[in-house]
Swiss-Prot record:
Signal sequence, start to end: none
Any coiled-coil regions, as ranges: 79-118
Acidic residues biased stretches: 272-282
Keywords of this entry: Coiled coil, Exocytosis, Transport
Coiled coil as UniProt keyword: yes
Protein name as annotated: Exocyst complex component 6B
Gene Ontology terms: biological process: intracellular protein transport; membrane fission; mitotic cytokinesis; vesicle docking involved in exocytosis; vesicle tethering involved in exocytosis
Oligomeric and partner information: The exocyst complex is composed of SEC3, SEC5, SEC6, SEC8, SEC10, SEC15, EXO70 and EXO84.
Annotated segments matching region Disordered: 258-282
Top-rank taxon, per record: Eukaryota
Similarity comment text for this entry: Belongs to the SEC15 family.
Disulphide linkage map: none
PANTHER family, per database record: EXOCYST COMPLEX COMPONENT 6B, SEC15
Organism field: Mus musculus (Mouse)
Length: 810
C-alpha cells in the first residue's frame, strides 16, 4: 500500500515538473519568476533540477544536430557576406555622401517647415482666439453700450441692456474671469442706475418746486384765453367750454407723453418752449415740463421690483412740497402779485399732479389727488380769509376776487371741485362792501368838504345840459329862464348822485363770474347800496351838519340838496333795475332806503338850523345891557335887539328855497326862543330890582320883536300867528305897565281872561323885584302918601298872588 501510494505521489510530482518545464520553455523570461517560485516552494526542487539538467542536455544535442546539419550553408553565407562587404561599404559611403548632400540641401526646407509649423500653430491659435473673441465680443459690446447709456443718462435703456447682458450674453462666456467680474458688478450697476435715476427724479422734483410759479402762470393764462374765447367768440356756457378745453389740454399732454417716454433722452426740468408759428400763443403748461425723469424712474423701479418704494417716495416728497406751496408769505396781502404768485404755485403743483395722474398707471391715484386737494383747499381758504382781511383797498380786493375766480376756473378745467372757493368769495364780497363803504366815506367827505354850498350857476346851454346829464333834474320854470341862471342845489348833489352810481358799478363788478343769479346780484347790490346810503352817506351828512363852524346858509343848502337827492332815489332804483334786469316788483326785492336817509339828514339840518338860530340869538342877547334901575325912557328899542332883528330878517330871506314848513318852523322856533330868552332875562336871579322905567324900555324891545313878527319874515303864517310867540311877554308887560291887577286877580282862572298867559309865580317874582325897588328908591318915600299907598298895594297884590299860587298847588 505504501509503495503504491509513493509511486502515485512520484508520478504526480513528475507530471508537475514536466508541466513547469513546458511552462518555462513557452513563457517569456520576464514572467518566469512565479513559476520558479512554485518550484522552490515545493519539496522536490532537487529532482526538478535533475529534470531541468536532463532537458537542457536534450536541447543541446538538438542544437548540435541542427548546427551540424546547416554548417555548410553557414560557411557559404559567410563567404557571400564577405563578398558583399566591399559593395556594402561602397554603398554605405554613397548613402553617407547622399545623406550629407540631402541634409545640406534639406536644411532650408526643414527651417521652412519649422516656420510653417509655427505659422500653422499661430493660425490655429488665432482662429481659436477669433472664435472666442467672436463669442465674447457681443458681451463686451453690450457692456460698452451699457456704459455709454449710463454716461448719457439713458437709464431705462441701460437697465434693459443690463438684463440682456445678464440673461443672454454672459451665460455663454461665463467661464471667463472678466465675465465673472461683470456678473459680480451687475448688482452694483443696478444700484447705480437706481441711484442715478432717483437723483434725476430729485432734480426734477426740485426743478418743479422752483418752477411751479411759471407752470401755474401759464395754466392760468390758458384758462383766461379760453374764457375770453368762450365769452367773445363761442358765446357758450363756461362749464361746457371748459370741458372742451380740458380735452384739448390732454391732447397736447398725450403728444408730450410720447416725446417723454422712458426711452427719451431729454434731461429733467423745465424746457424752453418757443412757438415758431405763432409767437403770441401762450405755451401749454405741459409744454414747459419734461416728465421723462419721472417716467424713467418709474419704469426703472418697476423693472427692479421696487415700484411701491418709488410711489411712496414720490407721494411723500410731493406732499412736503404741497405743504411748502400752501404756506403763504407773510406779506402776501400787500400786493396783488403776492396773491398771484401764491395761486400760480398751487395751480402749477396740481397741473403737474393731474398730468402725472393721467399719464402714469398708479403712480398717483384719484384718492391721493383728492386728499391733496382737500388739504390745499382748506389751507388756501384759511390763508385767503386771513390775508384778505388786511386789505383796505377795494381795488385790490376786486383784483383779488378776479384772481380767485381765474384760479378756481383754472383748477376746474382739471376736474378739481371749487365750490368752496366761490362760497368763500361771498364772504370776501362782504369785506369788499366794507372797504367800498370806507372808500366812499372818504369820497363823500371830500365832496362835502369841498362844496361851496351855493346853487350851481350856469351861463350856457352846454353847461346846463352837462349838469342835467349828471343828475336827473327837471324844472320847466328854470328851463324857461334866460342865462345866466342857477340850479337850486349845489355841486355836491350831482357829485354824490354819480358817486352812488359808481358805488353800484363797483358792487356789480364784484358779482361778475361768481355764478350768481340776477336776483342774487340785484339783492347784493341793493343791500350794499342801502348800507352806503343809511350808514356812510348818512354819517357824512350828519358830520357836516354837526360841524361847529357850519353856517345857516350851508344848512339851508343842505336841506335843499337832500330834498333833491331824495327825489332822485327812484332813478337809482331804475338804474339798478336796468343793470340787473330784475324788476322791483319781484318778490323779495330789497327796496332802497335813500328816502329815509335824506329825510333824516334834512331833519337833522333843520334841527341844526333851529339850534344855530337860537345860538345866534343867545349871542345877541349876551350884548344886552339893561339898566334895570333907570327911570328914563329912550323911546327906541335897544341897539342889540335892532341888530338881532336885522340878522333874523336877512337870515329868513335866505330861506326862500326851503320848503315852506321848514322856514315857518325855523321862524317860529326863533321867535319862541327869543321870547323865552327875553323872559329869562327879565326874571333872572341876578336882576334883584327893577324900575317901571326899565320895564317900559324892555317893553319897547318886545314891541320891536312883535313888529318883526307882524312883518311876515317868512310867508305862510296866518295873521298874528307869529306874534303868539311873544304873547306871554306881552301880557306880563301889559299887566305891570298898566298896573291892571284887579282885572288879573278877578279873571284869573277863567278861559277868556285878559291875562291868561301870565303865571302868578312869574308875576310874583317880577313884583318882588319892583317891591324892593319901591322900598329902597327913596328914604323919604315912606312919608309920601301915594308912595305908601303904592307900597301897600304891592304888598296886597303880592299876598293875593301867593294865595293864588298856594291854592293852585293845593
Amino acid at each position: 500500500m505504501e509503495r503504491a501510494k509513493m509511486a502515485e505521489e512520484s508520478l504526480e510530482t513528475a507530471a508537475e515538473h514536466e508541466r513547469i518545464l513546458r511552462e518555462i520553455e513557452s513563457t517569456d523570461t520576464a514572467c518566469i519568476g512565479p513559476t520558479l517560485r512554485s518550484v522552490y516552494d515545493g519539496e522536490e526542487h532537487g529532482r526538478f533540477m535533475e529534470k531541468l539538467e536532463t532537458r537542457i542536455r536534450n536541447h543541446d544535442r538538438e542544437i548540435e544536430k541542427m548546427c551540424n546539419f546547416h554548417y555548410q550553408g553557414f560557411v557559404d553565407s559567410i563567404t557571400e557576406l564577405l563578398k558583399v562587404r566591399g559593395e556594402a561599404q561602397k554603398l554605405k559611403n554613397q548613402v553617407t555622401d547622399t545623406n550629407r548632400k540631402l541634409q545640406h540641401e534639406g536644411k532650408e526646407l526643414v527651417i521652412a517647415m519649422e516656420e510653417l509649423k509655427q505659422c500653422r500653430l499661430q493660425q490655429r491659435n488665432i482662429s481659436a482666439t477669433v472664435d472666442k473673441l467672436m463669442l465674447c465680443l457681443p458681451v463686451l459690446e453690450m457692456y460698452s453700450k451699457l456704459r455709454d447709456q449710463m454716461k448719457t443718462k439713458r437709464h431705462y435703456p441701460a437697465l434693459k441692456t443690463l438684463e440682456h447682458l445678464e440673461h443672454t450674453y454672459l451665460p455663454q462666456v461665463s467661464h471667463y474671469r472678466f465675465c465673472k467680474v461683470m456678473v459680480d458688478n451687475i448688482p452694483k450697476l443696478r444700484e447705480e442706475i437706481k441711484d442715478v435715476s432717483m437723483s434725476d427724479l430729485k432734480d426734477f422734483l426740485e426743478s418743479i418746486r422752483k418752477h411751479s410759479d411759471k407752470i401755474g402762470e401759464t395754466a392760468m393764462k390758458q384758462a383766461q384765453q379760453q374764457r375770453n374765447l368762450d365769452n367773445i367768440v363761442l358765446q357758450q356756457p363756461r362749464i361746457g367750454s371748459k370741458r372742451k378745453s380740458k380735452k384739448d389740454v390732454y391732447t397736447i399732454f398725450d403728444a408730450e407723453v410720447e416725446s417723454t417716454s422712458p426711452k427719451s433722452e431729454q434731461d429733467s426740468g423745465i424746457l424752453d418752449v418757443e412757438d415758431e408759428e405763432d409767437d403770441e400763443e401762450v405755451p401749454g403748461a405741459q409744454d414747459l415740463v419734461d416728465f421723462s425723469p419721472v417716467y424713467r424712474c418709474l419704469h426703472i423701479y418697476s423693472v427692479l421690483g421696487a415700484r411701491e418704494t418709488f410711489e411712496n417716495y414720490y407721494r411723500k416728497q410731493r406732499r412736503k412740497q404741497a405743504r411748502l406751496v400752501l404756506q403763504p408769505p407773510s406779506n402776501m396781502h400787500e400786493t396783488l402779485d403776492g396773491y398771484r404768485k401764491y395761486f400760480n404755485q398751487i395751480v402749477g403743483f396740481f397741473v403737474v399732479e393731474d398730468h402725472i395722474l393721467h399719464t402714469t398707471q398708479g403712480l398717483v391715484n384719484r384718492a391721493y389727488i383728492d386728499e391733496l386737494w382737500e388739504m390745499a383747499l382748506s389751507k388756501t381758504i384759511a390763508a385767503l380769509r386771513t390775508h384778505s382781511s388786511y386789505c383796505s383797498d377795494p381795488n385790490l380786493v376786486l383784483d383779488l376776487k378776479n384772481l380767485i375766480v381765474l384760479f378756481a376756473d383754472t383748477l376746474q378745467v382739471y376736474g378739481f371741485p371749487v365750490n368752496q372757493l366761490f362760497d368763500m368769495l361771498l364772504e370776501i364780497r362782504d369785506q369788499y362792501s366794507e372797504t367800498l363803504l370806507k372808500k366812499w366815506a372818504g369820497v363823500f367827505r371830500n365832496i362835502l368838504d369841498s362844496d361851496n354850498y351855493s346853487p350851481i350857476p350856469v351861463t350856457s346851454e352846454e353847461t346846463y345840459k352837462k349838469v342835467v346829464g349828471q343828475f336827473p333834474f327837471q324844472d320847466i320854470e328854470l328851463e324857461k329862464q334866460p342865462f345866466p341862471k342857477k340850479f337850486p342845489f349845489s355841486e355836491f348833489v350831482p357829485k354824490v348822485y354819480n358817486q352812488i352810481k359808481e358805488f353800484i358799478y363797483a358792487c356789480l363788478k364784484f358779482s361778475e363770474d361768481l355764478h350768481l343769479s340776477s336776483t342774487e346780484v340785484d339783492d347784493m347790490i341793493r343791500k350794499s347800496t342801502n348800507l352806503l346810503l343809511t350808514r356812510t352817506l348818512s354819517n357824512s351828512l350828519q358830520n357836516v351838519i354837526k360841524r361847529k363852524n357850519i353856517g345857516l346858509t350851508e344848512l339851508v343848502q343842505i336841506i335843499i340838496n337832500t330834498t333833491h337827492l331824495e327825489k332822485s332815489c327812484k332813478y337809482l332804483e331804475e338804474f339798478i333795475t336796468n343793470i340787473t334786469n330784475v324788476l322791483p316788483e319781484t318778490v323779495h326785492t330789497t327796496k332802497l332806503y335813500g328816502t329815509t336817509t335824506f329825510k333824516d339828514a334834512r331833519h337833522a339840518a333843520e334841527e341844526e338850523i333851529y339850534t344855530n338860530l337860537n345860538q345866534k340869538i343867545d349871542q345877541f342877547l349876551q350884548l344886552a345891557d339893561y339898566d334895570w334901575m333907570t327911570g328914563d325912557l329912550d323911546n327906541k328899542a335897544s341897539d342889540y335887539l335892532v341888530d338881532l332883528i336885522a340878522f333874523l330878517r336877512s337870515t329868513f330871506a335866505v330861506f326862500t328855497h326851503l320848503p315852506g314848513k321848514v322856514a315857518q318852523t325855523a321862524c317860529m322856533s326863533a321867535c319862541k326862543h327869543l321870547a323865552t330868552s327875553l323872559m329869562q332875562l327879565l326874571l333872572e336871579a341876578e336882576v334883584r330890582q327893577l324900575t317901571l322905567g326899565a320895564l317900559q324900555q324892555f317893553n319897547l324891545d318886545v314891541r320891536e320883536c312883535e313888529q318883526f313878527a307882524r312883518s311876515g319874515p317868512v310867508p305862510g303864517f296866518q295873521e298874528d300867528t307869529l306874534q303868539l310867540a311873544f304873547i306871554d311877554l306881552r301880557q306880563l308887560l301889559d299887566l305891570f305897565i298898566q298896573w291892571d291887577w284887579s282885572t288879573y286877580l278877578a279873571d284869573y282862572g277863567q278861559p277868556n281872561c285878559k291875562y291868561l298867559r301870565v303865571n302868578p309865580v312869574t308875576a310874583l317874582t317880577l313884583l318882588e323885584k319892583m317891591k324892593d325897588t319901591s322900598r329902597k328908591n327913596n328914604m323919604f318915600a315912606q312919608f309920601r302918601k301915594n308912595e305908601r299907598d303904592k307900597q301897600k298895594l304891592i304888598d296886597t297884590v303880592a299876598k293875593q298872588l301867593r294865595g293864588l299860587i298856594s291854592s293852585h298847588h293845593s
